[in-house]
């Protein structure tokens, strides 16, 4: 393809900025990144409090986050943040030790069974489900894999046929039941559901295991974590500064027309002409009466074709809420806490995890995280969820004295099992490049 083509990238989050970096490395330098907000980073948002940055979005990484490491190397930065740790509480606020046999004598048989199932699960993923951790979803519904290996930072291209991969379209809970490893859900749930990715009875196993492949999950379990002193947003600020064409902030896109082999983007009232367009912003946001969250999808401002509308209208997303709160000194938690009891559908809207970022100072905010949507439940209204979380903090013994920041974010776009099984990703892959998009 001609290296002089003009490429428009919509979105200055991790995906959009990374697209610019990889294009630049391949010799494509006529790209423009349009970001509607006054900052880059998307869901990596790290505001300041008392001269230090805290996390309203992404918090941490692990050594198997190879794409993030690509950015670090490109920018000459590294993961230099505070060492995180955590404990656990039940929904009544009592500190528990769910994985320590000596603290749970009655649970020793279950913990031993979990350990056996974990070993079995690792073996199954490497053998029966070979290719499960290959980057991307193409081919999975057809029983094949094609992409880049997650086994090492080299990410060599791999492909192959494995009919068992079709099982990954099942909800993760059913996938575990099918393979006799139900108890591994107790391990995977912490870095999955509490991080906003939904519930195991609704989310296809493919999402769970491609995000949390065995190696990545074990890094979380062993607290082998990366953080950044200046926050995850700093990664993308650094990348933006190193790009030849930094993102143009406060870019409001009003219309996109694709015709006669060109792409016409109306941004801040001006029409700009491109040869290709890359979309890293939401493709579809379901319509809802009285919506005031400002969310729009690609199909709302593009000259969307019928095949695009048909596919993208199957996209769902999570309602994931974050509060940053202050506490009185005597109420400040000594460490971060996970609340497993609240990571199940019937506890929708309750506090799942709350983080203390810095060990050396209590003059900081605590951030809380909650989910408000399950496919078989009514969405919990934002204000109701907010009140529930603040009440939960009281129950935990760490009541908030004030809320200093809050965010409800369009999060984790995905499709459910029927659409996944029907080859949704392969249909989308077949459209790549169509309409110069």
Provide a role label for each language-model segment.
Residues 5-32:
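N-terminal Rossmann-like FAD-binding beta1-loop-alpha1 element of flavoenzymes
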Residues 15, 39, 284:
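Conserved Rossmann-like nucleotide-cofactor binding loop
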Residues 24-48:
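Glycine-rich FAD pyrophosphate-binding loop
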Residues 26, 252-366, 370-377:
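Mid-domain catalytic core of redox enzymes
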Residues 43, 51-83:
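Conserved FAD-binding subdomain of flavin-dependent enzymes
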Residues 69, 73, 78-202:
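Mobile amphipathic helical/loop "lid" adjacent to a hydrophobic cofactor/ligand pocket
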Residues 211-262, 276:
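Helical element adjacent to the flavin cofactor pocket in flavoenzyme catalytic cores
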Residues 351-437:
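Conserved flavin/dinucleotide-binding core of flavoenzymes
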